[in-house]
Amino acid sequence: MGEEKYLPELMAEKDSLDPSFVHASRLLAEEIEKFQGSDGRKEDEEKKYLDVISNKNIKLSERVLIPVKQYPKFNFVGKLLGPRGNSLKRLQEETGAKMSILGKGSMRDKAKEEELRKSGEAKYAHLSDELHVLIEVFAPPGEAYSRMSHALEEIKKFLVPDYNDEIRQEQLRELSYLNGSEESGRGRGIRGRGIRITPTAPSRGRGGAVPPPPPPGRGVLTPRGTTVTRGALPVPPVARGVPTPRARGTAAVPGYRAPPPPAPEAYEEYGYDDGYGGEYDDQTYEAYDNSYVTPTQSVPEYYDYGHGVNEDAYDSYAPEEWTTTRSSLKAPPPRSARGGYREHPYGRY
């Protein structure tokens, strides 16, 4: 215990001694150097042999001098600590070594530092030394020296007296973030290009496919412009009120791009007044049904598809009547479920 207190007392006495006592100061300095040298020799004797087989943890410690005498106006302690001490904490986590800033000027309160230095306690003996960074590593031999090497390389970057280097700029950004003066305020989302989410329901717009309806009954009318084959189901209609291309061609407009393939037309698109509704009302469905129950009058009657229909009924399919539609677009009352027109009697066989 006497040796631990002896060195701090020598340092405190040397600092408190008046500079006019030159010889006394020299003797004290020699005594301090001798005592520190003896401790160093003891440590060297203990570390004379290194056991790497057992892989036991060893303790390494190095004191790195901070160049405050060469650059007295630069705040090395502030750069080493960083905002709220985060820089030194991250440096210790990265290197796996313990780092402590010791020596004269390591405390912010100079009066408190001087008081502790004169107290003579062993834990404050470092206040009489030069400002330095104590690096300590406790690990197996190979890893310990690797950590110490990494720590020395990293600590050297913090001892460069540059106010605008990368470390300093990063600390300024971190400080502004901690103070809440970041340009982009907290809580504001990052602006970016929105992602369009496609709807799961099928589109019913122009050209959109819709689920096919159930098979219709016999005698259901088919849209205009579609080819009807025996036994084939009609094409499902599109949404009501959506403009669709006509079956007959129209004059091309300059700059007009050709539309996609024609989609099925709706029954409500044309109404029942133009074309089918207006002309077939004169001839009721009973006229067609009579041909099944009454005997045939002559052979040509079976091949005459205009039987019972006057000539004006076919003339009404003029091109100008295709463009006229009823404004209400409402379907007439449903008729009987019988066939819309009579098929050839021999076609069934």
Swiss-Prot record:
GO cellular component: nucleus
Top-level taxonomic group: Eukaryota
Pfam annotation, one family: Sam68-YY
Tissues showing expression: Expressed in the cortex, cerebellum, striatum, midbrain, brainstem and thalamus of the brain (at protein level). Expressed in neurons (at protein level). Expressed in brain and testis. Expressed in the dentate gyrus of the hippocampus.
Family (UniProt): Belongs to the KHDRBS family.
This protein's record includes keyword Translocase: no
Subunit structure as annotated in this protein's UniProt entry: Self-associates to form homooligomers. Interacts with SAFB, SFRS9 and YTHDC1. Found in a complex with KHDRBS1, KHDRBS2 and KHDRBS3. Interacts with RBMX. Interacts with the SH3 domains of FYN and PLCG1. Interacts with the SH2 domains of FYN, GRAP2, PLCG1 and RASA1. Interacts with RBMX.
Region (Disordered): 181-263, 320-349
Basic and acidic residues compositional bias, start-end: 340-349
PTM text: Methylated. Phosphorylated on tyrosine residues by FYN. Tyrosine phosphorylated by PTK6 and SRC. Tyrosine phosphorylated by SRC during mitosis.
Alphabetical keyword list: Methylation, mRNA processing, Nucleus, Phosphoprotein, RNA-binding, SH3-binding, Transcription, Transcription regulation
CDD domains referenced in this protein's UniProt entry, alphabetically: KH-I_KHDRBS2
Omega-N-methylarginine: residues bearing it: R230, R240
Name the UniProt record assigns to this protein: KH domain-containing, RNA-binding, signal transduction-associated protein 2
